[in-house]
Amino acid sequence: YDWYVYSAFALYFSKSFFFFFDTTAQLLNTAAVFAIGFLMRPIGGWWLGKYADVRGRKAALTLSVLLMCTGSLLIAVVPPYAVIGVWAPVVLVGARLLQGLSVGGEYGTSATYMSEMATAKHRGFTASFQYVTLIMGQLLALGVLLVLQATMSDTDLNGWGWRIPFAVGAVLAVVALWLRRSIDETHSFEVLPASERRGIASELLKHPRALLTVLGLTAGGSLGFYTFTTYMQKFLVNSAGWSKADATSVSAVSLLVFMVLQPLFGALSDRFGRRPQLIVFATLGVLGTIPMLTRLAVASDWMTGFWLIMAALVVMSCYTAISG
């Protein structure tokens, strides 16, 4: 939720930090700050992954929530550029760096936790729930946006209303922290001798081809996922000329269907294998992405936009359901 709420509300808070630019430049600067968070994700994945190998999956998942909570709280309370000048975007960048560390570690650790908890026969089905929870976070962010759009004026949303979802995120993180403190450690970690509880970076370097293959699949999958989920709302507003409300609603409905598809594709991978799904994803992703985005840019009605987005998300499900 905390990671995605930034993108969902970017249309409203961008001028609070970059008010001296025009609307397009404000969004580009806001998107650049969003991208900065991604720079910290590999570091977060390495750092929290190493922490998880030494202290346990449960401890790493708890730490990732603390980092995310701190980032959300900073964004919720930081004064705008008009009050503290350049320090406003500086604090925003710092908050996103913390959230990038959190998300980078969260993905790998949560995937490890679920795969270690799963049985071999249902590993794909179980691992698919990583993206179910991710999409639930996106849906919650869009749900908060829809409620605020219905109950507040654009003036209030642009002025101060955009802070509400970040404050909500900080509170939800506290709840998540309490829940994670009560989860069980995985059996795989508990039976591992203390002398062997260390990272495996040196082992990865012994398999460069496999490492590069995984990096390529992850880069392509992540780019596609964020394009057709996180970025789609802004694409429909800025490129297709949709209203903010229509763009938000079609994004929410398509994400709901996308979430339901994850266990189905996870179960299919248990039956037919992961490799065929990855081949379908890579082939259709390369051939279909540009035509879909080109058609979406001129889509004028809700149903056309929805079915085009869903076509892309069905292809994405071949990857997301098993990427953990």
Locate each region found by the language model:
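C-terminal transmembrane helical hairpin of 12-TM major facilitator-type secondary transporters
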Residues: 275-324
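Glycine-rich segments within core transmembrane alpha-helices of 12-TM secondary carriers
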Residues: 102, 124-149, 172
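Extracellular/periplasmic helix-loop-helix junction of adjacent transmembrane segments
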Residues: 10-43, 90
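Hydrophobic core of transmembrane alpha-helices in multi-pass small-molecule transporters
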Residues: 78, 84-104, 303-322
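Central cavity-lining transmembrane alpha-helices of secondary-active solute carriers
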Residues: 31-50, 67-71, 252-265
